[in-house]
């Protein structure tokens, strides 16, 4: 309930993460409440170590990744920071504990040969293929392409094209350049937009 009250405009993924942090906190404390007066640097360090070996959710086997643990610990620290602001804590304990370091993951990109192979590969669903290729050329997520309308594809003052989308995940506008090849995948622009 506090999630929807404090963060009414949060995306589903943010809410899922907050809930998962709650589940893992209960798991750490074996279902017992953790009173504010017992929260200490040592407790947070213990929780940090717990998160680094915490189980995956659902029916998945194994432990969460270090980057997921980092996200969850940041959420926990944000909650404690808010508890300090709301005067449930007299000390900003969140500032006294370092977060979990994220591991940089290399971004995997398709080579031009791989893209050409995809272009040349037959597909029964032409719309799906064009949407996939549009995604490759623009960097837009499939979920954002599904809701994309012509009025969101605009010509800039320099004569180039861009897609203006409200990112489903972040709820913020994002401006993605649309090259001519990507524009051609969209077909003919209707008069009614």
State where each predicted segment sits.
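Short, intrinsically disordered, charge-balanced linker/junction segments flanking boundaries
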Residues: 1, 183, 189-193
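Surface-exposed alpha-helical interface segments used for non-catalytic interactions
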Residues: 42-45, 74, 116, 180, ...
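N-terminal DNA-binding recognition helix of tyrosine site-specific recombinases/integrases
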Residues: 21-28, 34-45, 53-95, 141-143
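Short, aromatic/basic-rich helix-turn unit that serves as a nucleic-acid recognition element
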Residues: 1-22
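Conserved tyrosine-mediated DNA breakage-rejoining catalytic core shared by Y-recombinases
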Residues: 96-104, 108, 147-188
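A structural signal for short hydrophobic/aromatic patches embedded in well-ordered alpha helices
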Residues: 18, 47, 118-119, 186
